[in-house]
């Protein structure tokens, strides 16, 4: 027994001496500052019987185009899964709308609520590929000048990859709690959950 224990300790000692860390020779590299232009988007969506009204605030320049679309969840997806961002939505937008940023950085987008008895995922996007040339000069045609931060996403537009910014919100069934006459906050895809505000 003592021989086995001694052999195990010797083996562990030899193994650990070969795994030492040499910290004195490591060089510390400074963390580079983020490059690019930071895009901030915040807002809400008002759920009405026949229409969804997105109201937002951004640091984008005047006349930047904001896009919004809804994707349907399957009938099997529950209220809890939808509001907790666990549900799987279909890939295609079934209703879309756009709005322009004004002088104060505000925008509004109206989308038809196709079927109030269904649940949807709302996506609000800044897509550089659909902007006028004066906006594309700032952010790049494919968003190459946008700084990576919360809400930054890559998606396909007309077969090309584009970098942009996204916010989301659940659109619950009109008969669900807070499904009609309530505002929901727009949130980041991976950072928290949208909740009703009123």
Give, region by region, the residue ranges found by the protein language model.
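Bacterial signal peptide processing site
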Residues: 20-22
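Structural beta-strand segments of beta-rich domains
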Residues: 50-54
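C-terminal motif of bacterial Sec signal peptides marking the signal peptidase cleavage site
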Residues: 15-18
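Ser/Thr-rich low-complexity repeats and stalk/linker segments
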Residues: 29, 33-47, 60-180, 189-198
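Positively charged n-region of N-terminal signal peptides that target proteins for export
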Residues: 1-5
